Design a protein with these regions (language model features):
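A generic structural signal for secondary-structure junctions
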Residues: 23, 62-66, 97, 126
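Sequence/structural segment immediately N-terminal to covalent heme-attachment motifs in c-type
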Residues: 31-53, 58
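Short, Lys/Arg-enriched N-terminal segments with co-localized hydrophobic residues
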Residues: 1-14
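C-terminal capping alpha-helices of c-type cytochrome domains
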Residues: 86-132
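Sec-dependent N-terminal signal peptides
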Residues: 18-27
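Gly/Gly-Pro-rich "capping" loops immediately C-terminal to redox-active cysteine motifs
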Residues: 48-86
Length: 132
């Protein structure tokens, strides 16, 4: 699709087609990322100021520390968070792969075995919280 955008810019024509192509690309990327988060949404909200559900609101989670916000974290998770104060992509990969391996007794039951799917979720979480 990138070649089409460059072609339109160089030829200075078809700007309507260029804008339509960019709009479709943006919408499909957002829809794809939303789909990656769909399983997470049953237990987590991801809006700025959103309410906690079974799990905490994940807005801006990749830019904040672990065990932060107004969610009531378990003692085990809070102790683990002291040793792991920030969510890094690597830590989030491990968490999504098997949270119970990292924190025994955590409420989170979700496990994503596929690395590519975990990366999609992490990309989405990273995007959700970036100031525009």
């Amino acid at each position: 699709m990138g070649w089409w955008i460059i072609f339109c810019i160089k030829r200075k024509q078809n700007m309507k087609k260029l804008l339509a192509t960019v709009a479709i690309l943006l919408l499909s990327t957002t829809a794809y990322a939303d789909k990656a988060f769909k399983k997470c949404a049953s237990c987590h909200s991801i809006e700025e100021g959103g309410k906690n559900k079974t799990g905490p609101n994940l807005w801006n989670i990749m830019n904040r520390g672990t065990a932060q916000g107004d969610y009531k974290y378990s003692k085990k998770f809070s102790a683990w968070a002291e040793e792991n104060p920030e969510w890094t992509p690597e830590l989030m990969h491990a968490w999504l792969e098997n949270s119970k391996k990292l924190v025994k007794g955590t409420k989170m039951n979700f496990r994503e075995k596929k690395e590519a799917k975990r990366q999609e979720i992490i990309d989405y979480l990273t995007k959700m919280g970036i100031e525009e």
